[in-house]
Amino acid sequence: FIAVHEHSRFKTPQFELSQEFADKLYLKHKTFVGSISRLETFAKCPLKHFIRYGLYLKENQDWQDIRIRGTILHHILETLTLKYKKDYVKVNVEQIHEVIENEFQFAKMIFPNKEKWIDAQIQELQAKTELILEQLAYFEKNWHMNIFKQEQKFSYSIPWHDMTIELYGYIDRIDTSKTSFCIFDYKSSDKDLRVADFENGTSLQLATYTIAAQAQNNLIPTGSFYISLKSAPVLHKPLSLNYRKKIPESTRIEIKETLDTFTQQKKLKGWAYQDITTYCDKDNLFTTKKESPSFEELRHKHTEIVTNLTEDILSGNIRPDHDTNACDYCAYR
């Protein structure tokens, strides 16, 4: 560290790499290889991208990290659906416990001194899984595509100038009919898909998965949606009180109103590219937006966004230009 006593001698740090150095750092045989989360990281903060993917500094792993819990929960659902197909939402308590117990067997062997803590995690995940399956039962009952693939590996190439952009990753779930398919991505929160987030590069996953799956399977894309694994309960208030009158009045709230609120909150959020109601018994499974792009618009815009982000990366940009509050939970802060 250098103590600077005169402001006239201070220079603002230049957060940039030379283009030559950036090429050596990020390119291999004229190919830029990256995951979707990598591009999203750069869109959110170029400096974090440089630290993570240029310097290869990884953040410490914490068992209590909510992202790790989400990954475990995701894998539990994947195991259940592989074993029981669409009937995974009908499994009993013992079947759920067996799957979760198997997930933690290795951890118990490696960390015998943490067995009680691990058992507590199993119980917590058991309760959470049961609640999630109850919530997903309504969707699976009224949704009539079949689960085709889970954790499907993909790679997608975009020719650009005299080089290639190679994107790769895993698609959580692909459902299909004879002619069409739909993409689902599991999330631990109530994530929504917004056009603004897609256009600024911070929400590219569903779009990329859809484009890659269409290229691989040559089926018609009907939509791409998030499946929320958040299991927060909806509070039922038996009465609504009006204090604006001299004598407060109460109005009874029927349980059906609360159930309708719950169903509304559990709609899957995302974009539809075709009339998705063809594959539904109910019209309240999905939340779709009027401004959702068509698939052709999506593909064209996606190529433009990805190439712009790649160009910015290779230009040497490592500035700390980040989203609001992005530093609050950043491992590199």
Feature-to-residue mapping (PLM):
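Beta-sheet entry/capping signal
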Residues: 7-8, 14, 47-48, 144-148, ...
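Non-catalytic protein-protein interaction segments used by genome-maintenance enzymes to assemble
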Residues: 145-216, 229
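A non-catalytic, helix-rich entry segment at domain boundaries
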Residues: 75-153, 157, 287-288, 296-299, ...
